[in-house]
Amino acid sequence: MERDAFERSLKAFTRRTPFHPFVVELVSGGQLQVYHPEALVFRNAIAVHFSQKGIPTLFDHQGVARMVETVEVSSPT
């Protein structure tokens, strides 16, 4: 992902009000689930994601394929 797009996307996703979870899809095929805006820290095209267990993952704009909103699937009634 281009550096400018990376920074714009992270800002947009983390600053939404109200916040909605989103997924960072990596070029390696991995996914980072961002459930809270404070679970992600970024500066100068480098980011650190903290999982719900507190495990940090470092990534940069070159390792990101795209970012997408998490879609909640409701159960049938």
What kind of region is each of these model predictions?
Residues 1-77:
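Motif-centric detector for short Cys/His coordination patterns
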